């Protein structure tokens, strides 16, 4: 999800060509508003905000530099005068209304963006820890099953994960594989050669 600041920056990134006739840019304004309205109706408020922002930027920052807008009325033909009047009407009536819509959208999108960041932060560490715990529990279960521990005995041994941290459980597995029985017992079990085979010596 993008922030409203990112959406605004992207909305400004378009090439304005003053040689394009004013009436074509006025049609572009209508298209931008239609796109914004359609996106809003289908629930894509981020894209709706993008189109509204581009519309306002075109009307207030780009079009004032258009040669037809900057020309005096005496130097324009009748059609151009009508286009200038239409543009001024946009500035007086439509733009203020669109700015209010954008303000409401911005408030909603900013709140959604903050919730999105919090959700991402909460989901980073917890799945990793959960997977490690489940993996160690499975290793302990397989280890004691192979050695004939069942029922209460296995439950007692595997319950270590409830009150020992990850490193302590690693040490428990290491002691068992090296022939030392868990929980301080003097019993020594035979370790199968299938565990941790010798690695070849590097020359």
Swiss-Prot record:
Main location: other
UniProt GO BP: protein K63-linked deubiquitination; ubiquitin recycling
Compartment annotation: Endosome
One of the record's GO cellular component terms: membrane
Cross-referenced InterPro entries: USP8_dimer (IPR015063)
Gene Ontology MF annotations: cysteine-type endopeptidase inhibitor activity; K63-linked deubiquitinase activity
Keywords: Endosome, Protease inhibitor, Thiol protease inhibitor
Superkingdom of source: Eukaryota
PANTHER family per record: AMSH-LIKE PROTEASE, FI19924P1
Function: Inhibitor of the DOA4 deubiquitinase involved in the regulation of protein degradation by the proteasome and maintenance of a normal level of free ubiquitin.
Family: Belongs to the RFU1 family.
Protein name (Swiss-Prot/TrEMBL): Regulator of free ubiquitin chains 1
Organism annotation: Candida glabrata (strain ATCC 2001 / BCRC 20586 / JCM 3761 / NBRC 0622 / NRRL Y-65 / CBS 138)
Gene transcribed to yield this protein: RFU1
């Amino acid at each position: 999800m993008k922030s409203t600041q990112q959406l605004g920056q992207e909305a400004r990134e378009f090439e304005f060509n003053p040689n394009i006739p004013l009436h074509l840019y006025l049609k572009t304004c209508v298209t931008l508003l239609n796109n914004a309205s359609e996106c809003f109706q289908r629930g894509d408020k981020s894209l709706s905000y993008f189109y509204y922002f581009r519309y306002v930027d075109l009307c207030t920052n780009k079009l004032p530099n258009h040669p037809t807008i900057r020309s005096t009325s005496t130097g324009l033909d009748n059609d151009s005068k009508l286009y200038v009047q239409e543009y001024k009407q946009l500035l007086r009536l439509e733009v203020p209304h669109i700015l209010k819509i954008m303000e409401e959208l911005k408030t909603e999108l900013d709140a959604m963006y903050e919730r999105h960041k919090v959700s991402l932060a909460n989901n980073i560490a917890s799945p990793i820890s959960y997977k490690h715990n489940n993996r160690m529990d499975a290793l302990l279960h397989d280890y004691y099953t192979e050695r004939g521990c069942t029922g209460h005995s296995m439950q007692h041994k595997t319950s270590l994960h409830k009150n020992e941290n990850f490193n302590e459980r690693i040490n428990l597995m290491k002691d068992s594989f090296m022939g030392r029985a868990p929980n301080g017992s003097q019993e020594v079990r035979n370790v199968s050669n299938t565990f941790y085979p010798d690695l070849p010596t590097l020359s």
